[in-house]
């Protein structure tokens, strides 16, 4: 596959993320992530999205079979997202103070990796609450596609999914290490940054875009991994007008892979 950046400058191109599922194995709390006790009442935490370091360019992808795909004005560069503290419930996800007049977390591509990591962090404390948060961020719903066919969004049925998915994630992961996607979270501070708000850097590059225009790969940095982790983000356009209805993230296991017990 050949990728060529053609030109630069224009409006934002949004994308989105899907999700797989959990089974019935009970995760063992690993500790960390701030206070293990939940707040007495649901908080309204602030999240921010800084896209000022992005540039926008035209992109052409040429596959080995000669097929060509062209993108106009796609974002390249780094996005900085922050959260005041780790949300601990679906209610706190619903009460988030969102930037730029947004009313729902699924209206912005770059919030999806941030909030999925926050949802996975809850696995350290309460499996059922974590499942609900994962399902909420992952947009676990059914909807009608443009051609009228019923489509299934990954993330639906998190609580009833194949236990194998959950067992594999648990076996090869340490749930407390998922916080290592935030800057400054290391083993020395129990994978919890010392300062708030918690900061996450997201990268978009030539490898973020493929022949599937409904998918973008966002790259995350972990203090525990030698290389950046790609995460698929999906977008849903109900009427094909290029204006995306919402975004969601796919597979939660990809964020947990390689964060092992050793």
Map each language-model feature to its residues:
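Post-signal peptide N-terminal segment of mature Sec-exported envelope proteins
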Residues: 31-56
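Short beta-strand edge/turn micro-motifs at domain boundaries
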Residues: 217-262
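Core segments of small alpha/beta cavity-forming domains
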Residues: 41-43, 55-181
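Core hydrophobic alpha-helical transmembrane segments of single-pass membrane proteins
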Residues: 10-14
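C-terminal motif of bacterial Sec signal peptides marking the signal peptidase cleavage site
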Residues: 18-21
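Bacterial signal peptide processing site
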Residues: 23-26
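Bacterial N-terminal signal peptides that target proteins for export
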Residues: 1-9
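Surface-exposed, charged secondary-structure patches
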Residues: 149-222
């Amino acid at each position: 596959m050949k990728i060529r950046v053609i030109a630069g400058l224009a409006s934002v191109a949004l994308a989105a993320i899907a999700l797989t599922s959990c089974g019935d194995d009970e995760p063992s709390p690993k500790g960390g992530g701030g206070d293990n006790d939940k707040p007495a009442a649901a908080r309204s935490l602030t999240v921010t999205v800084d896209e000022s370091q992005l540039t926008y360019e035209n992109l052409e992808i040429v596959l080995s079979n000669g097929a060509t795909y062209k993108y106009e004005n796609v974002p390249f560069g780094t996005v900085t997202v922050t959260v005041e503290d780790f949300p601990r419930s679906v209610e706190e996800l619903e009460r988030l103070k969102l930037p730029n007049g947004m009313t729902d977390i699924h209206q912005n591509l770059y919030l999806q990796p941030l909030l999925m990591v926050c949802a996975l962090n809850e696995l350290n404390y309460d499996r059922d609450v974590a499942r609900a948060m994962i399902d909420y961020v992952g947009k676990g719903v059914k909807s009608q596609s443009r051609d009228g066919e019923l489509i299934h969004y990954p993330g639906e049925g998190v609580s009833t999914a194949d236990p194998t998915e959950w067992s594999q994630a648990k076996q090869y992961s340490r749930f407390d290490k998922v916080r290592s996607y935030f800057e400054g979270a290391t083993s020395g501070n129990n994978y919890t940054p010392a300062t708030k708000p918690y900061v996450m850097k997201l990268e978009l590059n030539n490898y973020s875009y493929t022949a599937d225009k409904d998918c973008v790969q966002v790259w995350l940095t972990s203090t525990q991994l030698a290389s950046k982790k790609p995460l698929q983000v999906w977008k849903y356009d109900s009427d094909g007008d290029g204006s995306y209805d919402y975004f969601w993230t796919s597979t939660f296991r990809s964020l947990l892979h390689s964060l092992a017990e050793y």
